[in-house]
Amino acid sequence: AIAAVITFLILFTIFGNALVILAVLTSRSLRAPQNLFLVSLAAADILVATLIIPFSLANELLGYWYFRHTWCEVYLALDVLFCTSSIVHLCAISLDRYWSVSRALEYNSKRTPRRIKGIILTVWLIAAFISLPPLIYKGDKGKKPGGRPQCKLNEEAWYILSSSIGSFFAPCLIMILVYLRIYLIAKRRNRQGPHGKQAPGDGDTGPSALGGTSTISKLPPSILPAVGEANGHSKPPGEREGGEQMGDPTSPSTPPNQSSVGPEDGSQKQEEEEEEEEEEEEECGPPAPPTSSSLQGTPNFQPSQGSQVLATLRGQVLLARGPASLGLQPWRRRTQMNREKRFTFVLAVVIGVFVLCWFPFFFSYSLGAICPQHCKVPHGLF
């Protein structure tokens, strides 16, 4: 039963990691430099599944080392190399994510394939450095009283502790601290509004949070009439600069001194103005409704909540009620909370699975070096 389960895990590991490598190398959307970490990590896991696990399974089932003495030395070194490389890869990925979050502009410009390959090379060198002692110190490959050969790692306390710290405990501590820092940064930025300002409802009691309007830039009176068009509503023809109304506000947009023009002349004038408005819209984009105090009295005027700038042929006017000045929106708060929960769950899974898989082995392995007589873990549990 154990052999069947382990064999299935070997095949599943090879197949899954091969798909990861194939996806990154063939998909254009996955060819980002940071995905090279995944390729190298998948390669390390495939090597563990093909060169380490089968021989470990045979050694456990038979109870002795069936293969040659030379392969035992190579096997021990490769075991430490591939497992350490896999763990340190996870640590490097966490650091890469932290730098991309905390130093987005600076680090993303430096995140080149050459730089990522250099980090990957460093990871493999660290793993190789930790795996050298099994080749130098041959370990215990003697024979049991029954005369059967054994293949074990060096059981000296200094190597057990140093390899455990370098292969697991130090990378694990770095990962936990880094992902905790990433979570705090993401949580803070998620609760901030646009342009780095505090989101509505997080203590902001200014005019923007209460739905107030911002100040419109002061422009000459000759420019302000150019922003009279908003959502199909034109400025009343008889309105003066001071806000005084002249004539019927619902009449066509014509100057006061031409109020006596005949229907044909008036319609021709209106068509010319409409053509001029269309030309302005084509050059400057669709106009947004202004919120100037001089336009608040316009009949049927409903200010929009999205526009910030209205550009015309005669000038440019800053408009109020941008996205940062919206009132409290419950749906936005719910979205933020759901995003934080989802991000927390992902981090918990990543760290939890990593610790669950590796901590029992390294804890029991280190415990045998600290107190070999009184804290020895039973062989079956180990």
Curated annotation (Swiss-Prot):
Disulphide bridges, residue numbers: C72-C151
Residue ranges annotated as Extracellular topological domain: 63-72, 141-156, 371-379
Subcellular location: Cell membrane
Positions with biased composition (Acidic residues): 271-284
Annotated keywords: Cell membrane, Disulfide bond, G-protein coupled receptor, Membrane, Receptor, Transducer, Transmembrane, Transmembrane helix
The keyword Disulfide bond is assigned to this record: yes
One function term, GO molecular function aspect: alpha2-adrenergic receptor activity
Keyword field contains Disulfide bond: yes
CDD domains referenced in this protein's UniProt entry, alphabetically: 7tmA_alpha2B_AR
CC annotations in GO: cell surface; plasma membrane
Biased composition (Polar residues): 291-305
UniProt membrane topology term: Multi-pass membrane protein
Residue stretches spanning the membrane: 1-25, 37-62, 73-95, 118-140, 157-180, 347-370, 380-382
Stretches assigned to the Cytoplasmic side: 26-36, 96-117, 181-346
Chain intervals for the UniProt region annotation (Disordered): 192-305
Function: Alpha-2 adrenergic receptors mediate the catecholamine-induced inhibition of adenylate cyclase through the action of G proteins.
Protein family (similarity comment): Belongs to the G-protein coupled receptor 1 family. Adrenergic receptor subfamily. ADRA2B sub-subfamily.
Name by which UniProt lists this protein: Alpha-2B adrenergic receptor
